[in-house]
Amino acid sequence: MALDNLTPDRHQQIIINMSAERTAVVKGIAGSGKSLTLLKKAKQVSTLTNSYAIIVYTKSLKQFFVDELAEIGQTKNHVFYFKEWQKSTKPNFKYMFVDECQDFNAEEIADFRAHGRYCWFFGDTNQSIMGFEPTIYSPGHTVQSVEDTAKQIGVHPQDLCINHRLTIENAKVGEMIYPQTRLSFACIKHGPKPRLIKSVAQLDKIIELINGGLTDVGILVYYNNQVTFIRDYFQSRGIPVQWKTYDEMDIDFKSTSPKIITWHCAKGLQFNDVFIPCCGLNEYKQYVSFNIDPMAEKIPALYVATTRPLENLYLIYSNKLAPVLPVASSPIYSGNKSVANGPF
């Protein structure tokens, strides 16, 4: 998606028209164009100065921004993922843009502000999934809401209200997970209903559908080990893929090959066709030996995954569908009888 292809709605236009010489917080639901609005602001300041930076949490989201900025002749040196920023000399910038700011805590927000004269923070509290409990291997990581970041800075958050990514039909899955979002009511376009597929050969089913001519595919799973297993399986079937794990990445967002990434790494990204395998309880165990079932215990990250498709959402399971999702007979899914459900 080229940067100049973004046609802003009236809410986005307010942000775009604001002077960049201020510190601001912008909040918006999944699909409301936060990242693309950020890119517009970055493009604006890039015509004035090289002293700007974009901070994100994940390597995959960094790569998205790098690819987009390359289209306007900007180098990758303007974009940092979080650990990269922590290890850097932390240079000072005139403008700093932080995407998915709900992934950071008060101390980190203060650190960004200390190195940017004008700081812009974009985020959605409902997509806060980078908070981790401490373990013997890691000190953990705390986060704070977008609203708390606005209070910390002393500004009133600007709102992006319209969901441009999701169709009304696909939004109803995320809305089932988090009813308080009223996600489908923010959507303005219709499309195919989500497809619920029951199959004992889930990866073969995904390959079959991809071979039908799909060129903008995201395959989203919870564990990094699932990414590598699926990558190896697809490559053994002669299907080139792009992929990202915790410590390795081979991903080009301009490629038409399927992208295999984790739910966490998918945040901020979008694909025309999104496949989420292992939607049954404990089905992840065919790939990894960990004890946490993401379909039961990692619901915020699942919400993020279900809100990535531009057009088609495929939920695939083999046996017992996770109860956090609509039941198999739900009219939300393709092929089931419709009843009044949602805004239109």
Located regions from the model:
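Conserved helicase motor core of SF1/SF2 NTP-dependent helicases
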Residues: 2-74, 85-304, 308-344
